[in-house]
Amino acid sequence: MQWTLVVPVKALARAKSRLSDTADDGLRPGLALAFAQDTVAAALACPAVADVAVVTDDARAGRELAALGAGVVADEPGGGLNAALAHGAAVVRAARPESPVAALNADLPALRPAELARVLAAATQFPRAFLPDAAGIGTTLLTVAPGQELAPAFGADSRARHRASGAVELRLDAVDSVRQDVDTGGDLRSALALGVGPRTAAVAARLLIAGQ
């Protein structure tokens, strides 16, 4: 079974404001783009993934991610993250109604295709499932079987909200790269310790990060 992934990408100029203590205003847009590029490249390299649709209104992000092989869906609702994901899921469902769909965070720069494949294989057992983030508070992946509604509830406390909505929490070991999203300098250090993709590594080399 091959999946269609929906990856939301925020306008780069407004992305990753919580990394302000690690990357200045001039570097953060490039860092956010690098996260998305490494995430999408790893996802497309996963044998369980048929295609990736990026939902964004950022012209630069759309252009760079399309160059990697992703499809680009305009963020037409303009209603925030969950609206963008619901819209993206509807678009890909219209094109591939028989395909399972997963919403994947765009800030997983250490993502490993084999670990993503393990998570998606586990998710096939359930109509709707999710993977919590490394902090145990948020969500990095939400999956739905064909014919099921995505019903994303990303944002603050999304782990609890997805669980309350009936999605099954996936409890897997050795999938750290799929759980390690990056919102803070500490998150970035954790991702670097796992081993990030080449684009993130290149941008991160320009940052002064304690302990690196």
Curated annotation (Swiss-Prot):
This is Phosphoenolpyruvate guanylyltransferase. The keyword Oxidoreductase does not apply. GO terms for molecular function: GTP binding; phospholactate guanylyltransferase activity. The keyword Ion transport does not apply. Phosphoenolpyruvate binds at residues 139, 155, 158. InterPro entries: CofC, Nucleotide-diphossugar_trans. It comes from the Bacteria. Pathway: Cofactor biosynthesis; coenzyme F420 biosynthesis. One of its GO terms (biological process) is F420-0 metabolic process. It is an enzyme of class 2 (transferase). Guanylyltransferase that catalyzes the activation of phosphoenolpyruvate (PEP) as enolpyruvoyl-2-diphospho-5'-guanosine, via the condensation of PEP with GTP. It is involved in the biosynthesis of coenzyme F420, a hydride carrier cofactor. It holds the Pfam family CofC. Keywords: GTP-binding, Nucleotide-binding, Nucleotidyltransferase, Transferase. Belongs to the CofC family. It catalyses: phosphoenolpyruvate + GTP + H(+) = enolpyruvoyl-2-diphospho-5'-guanosine + diphosphate. Its EC number is 2.7.7.105.
